[in-house]
Amino acid sequence: MKVIKFGGSSLASATQLEKVLNIVKSDPERRFVVVSAPGKRNDEDTKVTDALIKYYKHYTKGVDVKADQEWIINRYQAMVDELGFKSTEMTKIAKSINDLATLPIEDNDFLYDTFLAAGEDNNAKLIAEYFRNNGIEARYVHPRQAGIFVSSEPGNARILPGAYDKLEELRESDEVLVIPGFFGVTPDNQICTFSRGGSDITGSIVAAGVKADLYENFTDVDGIFAAHPGVVHEPHSIPELTYKEMRELAYAGFSVLHDEALLPAYRLSLIHI
């Protein structure tokens, strides 16, 4: 049984999503798919998460948000159009984006987190539908339903100990479960995010919870390199690392894997790819 996580750059376009589909189809052991929000399609593009931050700032400052809402909704619609299938989820996605601007601003410590989490959450809905339209029995699972219960620390959520028992129940499903990364739900039902880049954390937590044999982390680079491939020409790859070595690299700024994703995996002796 495997848990796989796809970063934003791996989910940025129809071409990338077709690759994701083939990766999932190629191995029936890949039963849990954790997804980030759509990333940049090119250097001039905007990440959906950054667009949601802009939307949040405009909303809380009383600025008209119609353009923000339309851009985000059209971003998801563009992927559907490029993939060439009729989505029934798009109506729900559009409503969820628009409904953010109806949430209370005053005394709402989790408003920012709720805005940001919409990127991953809506992407998971869309990807699960895309899988179903292409022969994979897939189901979207909200972190609340999955059992990803976290502490009430906006922007810095921590998984609660009892969450792992609930997550283990997901093993019983025969479907491919698509779970949004980056956020969980507090005991009083508030959306609360991990730190930025926290989809890695979700993937590791899910892998530990379902007692996966392997946790695969797909990103836009083929492995871990000795230097940044965008700065150094053809740096050599590092085929194997201990948890301690990976932790030190993550703390030093290597962005391939979030440093907080290591502990859940370490406790279960999981393998990262």
Model-based region annotation:
Residues M1-L262:
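Nucleotide/pyrophosphate-binding catalytic subdomain
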Residues L268:
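Short glycine/threonine-rich loop/turn motifs
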Residues I271-I273:
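Conserved small/polar residues in nucleotide/adenosyl-binding loops
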